Design a protein with these regions (language model features):
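N-terminal pre-triad scaffold of radical SAM enzymes
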Residues: 1-29, 41, 46-67, 96-98, ...
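Auxiliary Fe-S-binding modules of radical SAM enzymes
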Residues: 2-6, 207-324
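Conserved beta-strand core positions
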Residues: 7, 59, 93, 118, ...
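Short glycine-enriched loops at secondary-structure junctions
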Residues: 12-15, 190-195, 241
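Short acidic/His/Gly/Ser-rich catalytic and metal-binding motifs that mark active-site loops
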Residues: 16-20, 195-202, 246-248
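Conserved non-cysteine loop/helix-boundary elements of the Radical SAM core domain that shape
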Residues: 28-42, 63-185, 189-192, 196-216
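Short helix-terminating capping/connector loops at secondary-structure junctions
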Residues: 52-56, 87-90, 280-281
Length: 327
C-alpha cells in the first residue's frame, strides 16, 4: 500500500446537504470544530518550521464536502494555504468532496487557488446501494465528476466504502471495476464502521445489518489491493483513521486500528499457502525483509497458526536484501 503524506484539516459535515446512513463526521474526524483561516496559517507555518522541506506532502481539507461549503469559507481556507505552497514547501492542496458538488465554477475556483488533487466520495457504484444509504447521488454523478476533474488536469482520487447497507460482495467487486474505469490516480478503501446515532446503528438494532462477514470484507480488500496494483492505481488508505472519538462512538462494523496491515498480511498468507502447496512438504521456510516480518507472520501470529491448522510448520527468517513485497 502506498504511503501518502498530508497535513489534514477536517471540516465536519459543514458542506454536506445530506445525512447518509453511515455518516457522523464529528465522530469520524474527531472534531466538532471547523478550522478558521488563522489556524491553517499557524499550523502550516509550524509544520514547515519543524520539518523543513515538505515537497512530498500536501495540505488537505477533508471530513466534509469541501466544494459544497459556502464559497467565501472555501476561499478563506484556500487563501490561508497559499503562502505555504511551492519550492521547499508543500507540493499542493488536496480536497475531498461529493461527486454532485463539482461543476465548472467549482473547478475554476479550485484551479485559481492551486488545488492539485480532488477526491470524490463515491462509496458505491451501485445505484440501489446509493439509494438505500441516502447518498443523494447516483453512479453517473461519479463518472461525470471524474471525467470533468481529469479533463481539467486535477489528480483524481476516489473513495469506496465496503459493506454498506444492502451491498453484496458482487456489488463491491462491480464497484471497484467501475471506479477503476474512471481512471483515478489514487483510491481509498474504507470498510464500513457503524457509529452511534446513525441510520446504520438503527439497522443494526433491527438485526438487518451487517450482511457481510469480517472475513468476506477482509478478503475483498485483499483482492482490491491486488487489482489496483495491476491497474496502476495507488491505494493510499485502507480503513478509517483510529481516533478516540471513533472508538467511543463505534457500535459495529469492520474496524481495526491497523486495517491496512491486516489486508497486506492476508496477501502474504496467500503467498505462503501457494508456496506450501507447491512444495508439498510439512515445513515451509521463507525469508522476508525485516520490515515485513510482522505482516508475514500475521497479527498475533495468525498466519503461522492458520498454516499449522493446515498441517504446515512455518519458519521465517529476516533478509535485508529482499524487497518488502516479497517472501
Amino acid at each position: 500500500m502506498a504511503k501518502h503524506k498530508t497535513l489534514a484539516f477536517f471540516i465536519p459535515h459543514r458542506g454536506c446537504p445530506h445525512q447518509c446512513s453511515f455518516c457522523d463526521q464529528r465522530t469520524i474526524s474527531g472534531t466538532v470544530h471547523a478550522p478558521e483561516p488563522e489556524e491553517i496559517t499557524q499550523t502550516c507555518r509550524e509544520m514547515l518550521e519543524r520539518s523543513g522541506t515538505l515537497e512530498s506532502a500536501e495540505i488537505a481539507f477533508f471530513g466534509g464536502s469541501f466544494t459544497a461549503v459556502e464559497p467565501a469559507y472555501q476561499i478563506a481556507l484556500l487563501e490561508a494555504a497559499q503562502p505555504f505552497l511551492g519550492t521547499g514547501k508543500f507540493s499542493g492542496i488536496r480536497i475531498s468532496t461529493r461527486p454532485d458538488a463539482v461543476d465548472a465554477a467549482v473547478l475554476e475556483r479550485l484551479k485559481a487557488y492551486h488545488v492539485t488533487a480532488v477526491e470524490l466520495g463515491a462509496q458505491s457504484m451501485c445505484d440501489r446501494v446509493l439509494r438505500l444509504n441516502a447518498r443523494g447521488h447516483d453512479a453517473q454523478a461519479v463518472r461525470t465528476a471524474s471525467a470533468m476533474l481529469r479533463q481539467a488536469g486535477f489528480s483524481l482520487g476516489l473513495q469506496q466504502m465496503v459493506g454498506l447497507y444492502g451491498s453484496t460482495l458482487q456489488d463491491e467487486y462491480d464497484t471497484l471495476e467501475q471506479l477503476l474505469a474512471c481512471r483515478p490516480e489514487t483510491l481509498r478503501i474504507y470498510p464500513t464502521v457503524v457509529l452511534a446515532g446513525t441510520k446504520l446503528a438503527a439497522y443494526c438494532q433491527l438485526g438487518v445489518y451487517p450482511a457481510l462477514s469480517q472475513e468476506e470484507v477482509l478478503d475483498y480488500c485483499a483482492d482490491a489491493l491486488c487489482r489496483c496494483h495491476e491497474a496502476g492505481v495507488r491505494v493510499i488508505r485502507l480503513g478509517l483513521h483510529d481516533t478516540p472519538s471513533l472508538r467511543a462512538g463505534m457500535l459495529a462494523g469492520y474496524f481495526h486500528p491497523a486495517y491496512g496491515e491486516l489486508v497486506e498480511s492476508r496477501l502474504y498468507l496467500r503467498q505462503l499457502q501457494k508456496a506450501a502447496a507447491d512444495c508439498g512438504k510439512p515445513e515451509l521456510f521463507v525469508e522476508t525483509a525485516p520490515r515485513t516480518m510482522s505482516k508475514v507472520l500475521g497479527q498475533h501470529g495468525c498466519n503461522r497458526k492458520m498454516l499449522a491448522e493446515q498441517g504446515v510448520t512455518l519458519r521465517v527468517q529476516e533478509n535485508a536484501e529482499i524487497g518488502r513485497a516479497h517472501v
